[in-house]
Amino acid sequence: MNQSYIRAKNVVVEFPIYNASHRSLRKSLMRATTGGRVAADASKRVSVRALDNVSFDFKPGDRIGLVGHNGAGKTTLLRVLAGVYAPVAGSLEVKGRIVSLIDLSLGMDQEATGYENIFLRGIMMGIKPKEIEKKLYSIAEFSELGEDFLNMPVRTYSSGMMLRLAFAVSTSIHADIVLMDEWLSVGDAAFNEKATERLSQVVENSSILVLASHSPKLVEKNCNRILTFQHGQIVEA
């Protein structure tokens, strides 16, 4: 039985704003209705509180939809779960292999070849080199980039080609926990069709899905729990 889970208690994420003038602070405060909470501490250091005492418990079978306006904290939470951002307060426990589909190009090197980037992206995701080596052919085949391009630096790729490669690597392993910011669309119509099929399989086989979206239909179709964010806080669960 899958024992994956995500437990958060009073998680806080703040981003410091260096050299912020009083005028820029006032402007930030005026914009606060569409973002996190802006504040200055006793030493006049300005920071944006992107997540403010967020708590939840995700269990196997949960399909979580994160909703809210731009800057509400949805993507910040996904990046915290992916290990990109660290909380400044509170506790976060994650058990299970995470596949993050929010920053597909993360860990890729523009000067390295496509083949080298398969390993770089895979290692960044926590996959052992031996496991990547076993999947190398199937990843290359799924990307449809061909031998010539896979032996070239990815700086020579179009954005679509790079996305194909990153997607092929990211969805090549079993995921206990899947993190998504909207539903991915990859490449031309033909490639996108098989990418959508694979993505559906990855999500179906996962224990927990966390999906941030502005589309009520997408959330309704794929999620069984909804967390509504406002100014970095969960206002409805």
Task: Label the model's feature ranges.
Residues 2-49:
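Pre-NBD coupling/linker segments of ABC/ABC-like ATPases
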Residues 40-47, 97, 102-165, 169-177, ...:
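ABC-family P-loop ATPase nucleotide-binding domains
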Residues 221-228:
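Conserved catalytic segment of ABC-fold P-loop ATPases
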Residues 47, 54, 62-63:
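Conserved N-terminal flank of the Walker A/P-loop in ABC nucleotide-binding domains
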Residues 192-204:
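Helical segment within the ABC ATPase nucleotide-binding domain
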